[in-house]
């Protein structure tokens, strides 16, 4: 936050509990007011939301890549692989997401030392959320793959010898 005039870690007890700027007692420089230690509330919210947005977007991208990859390959190849992936997906969908995230975090705490876990907490959180949310993406992408793989342009690509990877990612996925 290079353009933030208010450092969230600095205190100003003289500005403690300043009301928002739209009230009569409020100051224009503190749009949402200040907390008990004089920190600007808007700056604190923006500073905190940065981490939340990074974790949220990263977890969704991780779940999307994992779920679409597994769903696309399961729908395209079919057979026992599809059955295995979709049964695993069904089992994971029965476990609540928060419980799965706690399980992943607990396993990470058991594997990684405490100091290392403190440094990697955001990455563990992204992984835990992504692992608990990928089945929704897998089901949707598998269903779309089953619809698309029987169309003429996919059959034509198979006949002329295009590889399965190219068919999946250039013809079916888009």
PLM regions: where:
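Amphipathic cytosolic juxtamembrane alpha-helices at the membrane-cytosol interface
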Residues: 39-54, 58, 78-86, 146-150, ...
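Short, functional N-terminal and low-complexity linear motifs
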Residues: 8-11, 53-57, 109, 122-124, ...
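Generic hydrophobic transmembrane alpha-helix motif, especially the helices
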Residues: 31, 41, 62, 66-67, ...
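Residue-level detector of alpha-helical transmembrane segments in integral membrane proteins
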Residues: 12-13, 89, 128, 167
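Interfacial helix-capping/hinge residues at the ends of transmembrane alpha-helices
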Residues: 71, 101, 154-155
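Gly/Trp-centered helix-boundary motif
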Residues: 1-68, 73, 80, 94, ...
């Amino acid at each position: 936050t290079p353009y933030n005039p208010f450092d969230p870690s600095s205190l100003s007890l003289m500005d403690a509990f300043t009301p928002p700027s739209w009230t009569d007692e409020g100051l224009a420089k503190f749009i949402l007011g200040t907390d008990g230690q004089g920190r600007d509330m808007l700056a604190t919210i923006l500073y905190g939301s940065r981490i939340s947005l990074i974790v949220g977007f990263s977890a969704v991208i991780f779940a999307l890549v994992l779920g679409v990859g597994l769903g696309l390959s399961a729908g395209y190849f079919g057979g026992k692989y599809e059955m295995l992936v979709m049964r695993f997906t069904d089992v994971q969908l029965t476990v609540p997401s928060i419980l799965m995230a706690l399980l992943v975090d607990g396993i990470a705490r058991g594997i990684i030392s405490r100091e290392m876990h403190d440094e990697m907490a955001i990455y563990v959180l992204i992984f835990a959320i992504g692992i608990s949310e990928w089945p929704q993406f897998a089901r949707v992408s598998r269903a779309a793959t089953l619809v698309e793989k029987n169309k003429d342009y996919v059959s034509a690509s198979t006949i002329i010898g295009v590889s399965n990877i190219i068919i999946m990612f250039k013809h079916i996925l888009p």
